[in-house]
């Protein structure tokens, strides 16, 4: 998560791609743990309505990290050939390069079981038209009560289209994210705020710790999970029984 404006990193490090370079380096640090796939997601802050602000690239190639960053490199080479001056224009890059933003999430898949199709590769996205209801998630976990967690989703009235562990975790967090949004919406609606104003206030007051605490209360096992919401709040969750390697 870049804590300063994009122009700061261009000025200090001489490159507009400090965030992407760091993500690449951190993913390479886990290169030796085995790869059955890899994926990255990025978030652009402050985008105007109608512009995509979450992007994702996933690969199940033999060298997935290489393929992911080769795709980005190909885009950059085309920009360099056509508009070389744009490589130092952070505003232009943010509006024209999908993977360019202020927040990055990367994951390496080590498939102990399950299929290694692109659909099984993290990060996973739970999309919504409200920024504060968007959820992007990646992680490694070994929870022993997945069947119970899935049944709890059904008891809530949901009808999940998949039974995978990751989708169950995604929807579990998503349920409490939706609840938090509803509570805050009612609060600010009573104060007479417009819907636009309410969306801004929800982003300021969303209680991330409460959402994650409620979601993880019934998890049994080890896990490390990282993610972010569409308005920019990000998190890392580490279970008490976890020894999984991660970098932030």
Question: What feature does the model see in each segment?
Answer:
Residues 1-248:
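Conserved short alpha-helical segments that host acidic/polar catalytic motifs at enzyme active sites
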């Amino acid at each position: 998560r870049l804590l300063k404006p994009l122009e700061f990193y261009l000025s200090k490090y001489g490159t507009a791609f400090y965030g992407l370079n760091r993500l690449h380096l951190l993913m390479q640090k886990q290169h030796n743990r085995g790869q059955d796939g890899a994926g990255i997601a990025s978030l652009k802050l402050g985008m105007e309505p109608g512009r995509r602000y979450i992007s994702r690239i996933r690969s199940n190639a033999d060298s997935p990290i290489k393929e992911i960053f080769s795709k980005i490199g190909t885009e950059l080479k085309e920009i360099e050939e056509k508009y070389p001056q744009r490589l130092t224009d952070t505003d232009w890059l943010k509006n024209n390069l999908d993977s360019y933003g202020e927040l990055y999430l990367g994951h390496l898949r080590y498939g102990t079981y399950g299929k290694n199709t692109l659909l099984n590769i993290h990060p996973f996205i739970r999309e919504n038209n409200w920024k504060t209801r968007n959820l992007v998630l990646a992680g490694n976990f070994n929870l022993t009560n997945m069947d119970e967690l899935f049944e709890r989703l059904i008891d809530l009235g949901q009808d999940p289209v998949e039974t995978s562990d990751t989708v169950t975790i995604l929807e579990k967090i998503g349920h409490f994210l939706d609840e938090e949004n509803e509570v805050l919406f009612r609060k600010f609606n009573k104060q007479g705020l417009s819907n636009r104003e309410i969306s801004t206030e929800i982003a300021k007051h969303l209680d991330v710790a409460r959402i994650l605490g409620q979601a993880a209360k019934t998890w049994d096992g080890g896990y490390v999970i990282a993610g972010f919401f569409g308005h920019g709040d990000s998190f890392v969750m580490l279970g008490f029984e976890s020894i999984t390697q991660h970098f932030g």
